[in-house]
Amino acid sequence: CTLCHQIADVPELGTDAGESGHYTIETFADPFDRPAYGPYTNPRINPMRINAVFTPSHSAHVTDSALCATCHNLKTPVLNAGGELTADKFPEQMVYAEWENSAFADGGAEASSCQQCHMARAEGPVKISNRPRNLGTRDNFARHGFYGGNTLILDILDKNRAELEVGDGDFAAAMEATRATLQSAAALVIEETVVEEPAPGERELVVRLRVENNSGHKVPTSYPSRRAYIHLAAADQDGTMLFESGRLATDANGKPTGAIVGVDADTGAGFETHHGEITSEGQVQVYEAIMEDISGNQTYTLLNAARYSKDNRLLPRGFPRDPQTDPVVGKWSDIAMVGEAELDADFVAGSDRVTYRIPLDAATTSVTVTADFNYQTMAYG
C-alpha cells in the first residue's frame, strides 16, 4: 500500500522519464513527516502518524492514470547476440501509452481513468478505517481490487490458501470479479451469414463477424504471453460439423491441452499470421504480440526480446490507425501494430472484421454457426 501511496506528484509522472518503475518518493528529516497521499481532503492525521508513522496527505494525482504509468509503461533491456546490453529498450508493455492514444484518455470522447475501470467504487458513503471510532464517512471510495483479466496467480494462491491463512471465499470472489471484468473487455458480433456461388455448381457459406474492443487499451495488453482468439464452428442440419476454426486440442483423455488446433505457434512452426479472411480450419484468428530477438528469431523469453514480429492486438477506440495522418501521443514505435494487421483495412480503432468462407455440398440444407471470443493468460508452450 505504502509504495503507491508514497509516489510523489512530480513532472516526470506519466512521461518517459517516469516509466519502468522510475517513481519518486520524497525524502524527509523527521519520520513523522513521511507523506502517504490519498484522494480525500482534510484527512484525520494523528491516528495514522501515531500508528503507522505516515502523515496522510491529500493529492489528486493518486486518481490520475499517470500514476499507473510508473509500472504499466515498461521497457526492458535489449541484449546483443553476445548477451551484452545494448542502448535499445524493448516495450514489454505500454498500457498507459495505449490509453493515452485512445478515446478514453483525458479529454477524449469517452474519458475514463485507469482507476475508474480497475477500482470499482463502493456503494454509498463508507468508513475507510475503523479507527478512530468517531471517524466520518467518505463518498466515492475506490475499492482496491485492481481487477483485470487474469486469474492465473489468484488460482495458484487459492490452491494454497490454507498455508496463506486466507478464507475459503476470498480468492474465489476475486477471481469471479476478474472474470466479470474480462467479459466486459470485448464483444463478438456475427454481422452477416450468406450463401454465395464462387463458381458455377459451387456453394459456400460466407460468415462476416466483428470483434469489438471495449477497453481503454489494446486487448489483450501487458505481458506478451497473453492471447485472444476466435473460435467459430458451423454444423449442418444433422449436427455434423462442417467447419471449425479455433478448436482447443485435447489429450488422449479428452482434456484440453491449451494448444489451439491450426495455430502455427502451437506446433513450433513459427506463429499464426493475422487473417482478414479464413478459408480453412488450419487458419485461426489470434490476437497477440509475438517477440523476436536481436537476430530476428522468434522468442518467448522476455530478456531475449528486441522487437515484435507480430502485434495485432485489438486497438482501443480512438487509436491512431495511420501515424502519417493521425495525431500520436508519444512514440509510435512503442504502440504500433506490426505485421499483416497493418495492411488490413478492416482492422481499425475499436474493432476488427474477419470473413470466413465455408464450402457447402449439395446435401447441406441448413447451417448453424456459433462463434466465441476466447482468452488465454499464457500461450501454449
What are these regions (language model features)?
Residues T2-A362, V369-G381:
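Primarily the internal scaffold of c-type cytochrome electron-transfer domains
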